[in-house]
A protein has these predicted regions:
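Glycine-rich phosphate-binding loop of ATP-grasp-fold ATP-dependent ligases
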Residues: 8-13
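PLP-dependent aminotransferase class I/II
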Residues: 16-199
Length: 199
């Protein structure tokens, strides 16, 4: 539901500099120069560098390829949903009730997700529960990596945690998927406005 394109495990990489293509092939081919072998560039393939098993099945690759062929249509659909949310909730932001995503000037996005930031954790939890009671799935987005078990063990946090943890406590994702029904989208908008009109 949350990904713009999905295929199970796997993906596609876009390389805009030819000097990285060979390195990417080797990485994908478990550290071998197998792709060069299949092109007849080497007599046999060998282990030549770091790599892993990143190859997906042909069926999964075909499933992804079909989506990539429709990438513009998929992105436009998601952007329409994103823009509908953003427009519908702009008044709530103007009143200081919620915060909306900020897209810096000169930047574009692919509408991967739409989120709002509530005033605090308690409001977020109440909002998620209210939406659940109305058969709408809204979820919090992430737990800061520095507070995860591996983050505590291996990482560090530089500076003062003024935004990361507080924002993760406030952030909630709204339903965002290809071909969301217009009635469902309107319901999300109406129930969100209903909840926050009490704030």
């Amino acid at each position: 539901e949350t990904k713009n394109y999905s295929m199970g495990e796997g993906g596609a990489i876009v390389i805009n500099n030819e000097k990285y293509i060979e390195k990417a092939e080797i990485l994908r081919e478990k550290g071998t120069n197998r792709s060069q072998f299949f092109r007849g560039q080497v007599a046999k393939y060998n282990w030549v560098d770091f790599g892993d098993s990143y190859l997906q099945s042909d069926l999964n690759a075909a499933y992804l390829w079909a989506q990539l062929e429709k990438a513009d249509e998929i992105n436009e659909n998601r952007l329409n949903t994103w823009n509908s949310y953003n427009k519908a909730f702009s008044e709530l932001q103007e009143k200081g009730i919620i915060s909306l995503p900020v897209i810096p000037e000169g930047c574009v996005h692919n509408a991967h997700m739409f989120y709002i930031k509530c005033k605090n954790l308690e409001t977020r939890q109440a909002y998620i529960q209210f939406m659940k009671e109305n058969d709408i799935l809204c979820v919090f987005h992430y737990v800061p990596l520095h507070s995860a078990p591996a983050g505590i063990k291996f990482g560090r946090f530089d500076g003062k945690d003024e935004h990361t943890t507080p924002d993760s406590d406030r952030l909630v994702r709204l339903p965002m998927y290809y071909n969301i029904d217009k009635n469902d989208l309107q319901k999300v908008i109406e129930k969100t406005i209903e909840f926050f009109s009490k704030e």
